[in-house]
């Protein structure tokens, strides 16, 4: 549901009210009100419409100018770290370390999210198989096709078994 402010509720996994983000004089998000229930949801719009800015804002990666919201019950203005621990995020941009093997890239993502090393390695093997990269897991990411890089980013997002998965331009470059 997009549009029309509503009070925060337990039935929504993502909810914003009057969310505003400005970069200097540029208005990137203009009083965004949305409420998303569990399930699959897509966010569509032209280039420059603010989709990535909205995703980074609800993840607590960039600060709001005004307004507020909650993701999985956590305040987006003050609890970004807690939100990111519960969410798998597959960014649009290149975020992989080129010379690192896929297995170590995914393991490293798990460790950054608080997993111990042995659990992260075990889970990295599982998610790389899940995304179809079992046989390529010991290859350097720099040798991967764009599709394989996207699959590696997805594995990084899934490593910690998140409650919610957010993919920004998951088919970018495919």
Task: For the regions a language model picked out, list residue spans one by one.
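Walker A (P-loop) phosphate-binding loop of ABC-type ATPase nucleotide-binding domains
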Residues: 46-50
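Catalytic Walker B motif of ABC-type/P-loop ATPase nucleotide-binding domains
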Residues: 165-168
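Conserved ABC transporter NBD signature motif
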Residues: 67-78, 82-83
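Conserved ABC ATPase "signature" region
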Residues: 107, 111, 118-136
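Hydrophobic anchor residue at the start of the ABC signature
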Residues: 154
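Conserved catalytic motifs of ABC-family nucleotide-binding domains
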Residues: 161
């Amino acid at each position: 549901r997009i549009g029309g402010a509503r009070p925060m509720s337990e039935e929504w996994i993502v909810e914003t009210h009057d969310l505003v983000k400005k970069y200097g004089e540029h208005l990137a998000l203009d009083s965004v009100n949305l409420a998303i229930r569990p399930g699959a949801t897509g966010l569509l719009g032209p280039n420059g419409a603010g989709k990535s800015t909205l995703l980074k804002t609800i993840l607590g990666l960039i600060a709001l100018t005004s307004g507020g919201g909650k993701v999985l019950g956590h305040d987006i203005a003050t609890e970004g770290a807690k939100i990111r621990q519960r969410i798998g995020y597959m960014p649009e941009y290149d975020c992989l370390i080129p010379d690192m093997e896929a297995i170590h890239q995914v393991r490293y993502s798990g460790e950054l999210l608080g997993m111990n090393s042995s659990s992260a390695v075990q889970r990295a093997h599982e998610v790389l198989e899940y995304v179809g990269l079992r046989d390529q897991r010991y290859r350097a990411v720099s040798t991967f096709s764009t599709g394989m890089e996207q699959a590696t980013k997805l594995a990084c997002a899934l490593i910690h078994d998140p409650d919610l998965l957010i993919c920004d331009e998951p088919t970018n470059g495919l």
